Amino acid sequence: MSTKIAINGFGRIGRLTFRNLIESDKVEVVAINDLTAVDMLAHLLKYDSAHGRFNGTVTHTENSLIVNGKEITVYAQRDPETLPWGEIGVEVVVESTGFFTNAEGMGKHITAGAKKVVLSAPAKGDIKTIVLGVNDDQLTDADTMVSNASCTTNCLSPMAKVLDEKFGIESGFMCNIHAYTSDQRIQDAPHSDKRRARAAAVNMIPTSTGAAKAVALVLPQLKGKLDGYAMRVPTITGSATDLTVQLSREVTAEEINAAMKEAAEGPLKGILMYTEDPIVSSDIVGDKHSCIFDAGVTSAKGNLVKVLGWYDNEAGYSARLANLVERLA
């Protein structure tokens, strides 16, 4: 019997995660909670500017979505504690509103009757962070609340894992070249970050990211060794992580590429993809790998190495989120 799933927050990640979960034979999405009108939720699920039309049928009633003939109840509650998760048998909740990112907030779903909660964002406080392929061996049956980290941490961590295990990382710095998101202005307008206040579709915008430091949550041996920043660019989706590291010994670009290829074909298969093709960002839109390693960019000088990993910050991340839900189901 399929495990019953609810999604709290039906935005970009919520909808794309739904697209993955609806294809699973292990889980069943039975409820969605979002304050948006149901007809709008149906429209945004059916049509997607970045990822195309939904491969199936989408209709709606006043209080439900009907997807491929299956009715999914839609709630509109601000406080997750008021949701009837226990009554309808929900076991795992995808928390993708962006608001309930600590134990207190995520715990509201437990109070409402759910057994486990998966967060689609970096967590605040003492919540276990899991990056599939990197530290998912730490998952236990006792884990009731876990974070899927960020899309960038999911891209960066597999590369860092391979580099550290094979050659040893002494220190490093990354630039996250990231597609614009809803936390930017499409025209110049006030924002708490003066750079993000500028028009997203016509500017390259430097801003902060915690992704590099967050790697230490899944690879604790790298604590204090990595830092970085983000450069938001005018693409709707499709991003890249440019990582420069000092290793414990001198290496060649060929050694680095060989290590990445071995990992991509072995323990990180399905998470890390290796390519020697001269690709660009549009080539990886819709790709569900966490990281597409671009061997043609690799360079090395002594123990100083630069590598590049592409990722669809929406499709890849939501695929991992769905995988993590299935692991907990």
What residue ranges belong to the model's regions?
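Short clusters of hydrophobic/aromatic residues that line enzyme substrate/ligand-binding pockets
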Residues: 65, 130-132, 145, 187, ...
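Generic secondary-structure signature for well-ordered alpha-helical cores
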Residues: 22-26, 161-169, 179-182, 209, ...
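C-terminal active-site/capping subdomain that shapes the small-molecule cofactor and substrate pocket
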Residues: 228, 240, 244-329
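Glycine-rich beta-alpha junction loops
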Residues: 35-38, 80, 123-124, 150-152, ...
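Generic structural signal for well-ordered, non-membrane alpha-helical segments
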Residues: 10, 14, 102, 149-152, ...
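N-terminal Rossmann-like NAD(P) cofactor-binding subdomain of oxidoreductases
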Residues: 1-197, 299, 321-323, 327
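Short, solvent-exposed beta-strand edge segments and adjacent coil->beta transition regions
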Residues: 142-143, 199-201, 238-242, 304-306
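Acidic, glycine-rich segments within the central catalytic cores of soluble metabolic enzymes
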Residues: 165-236
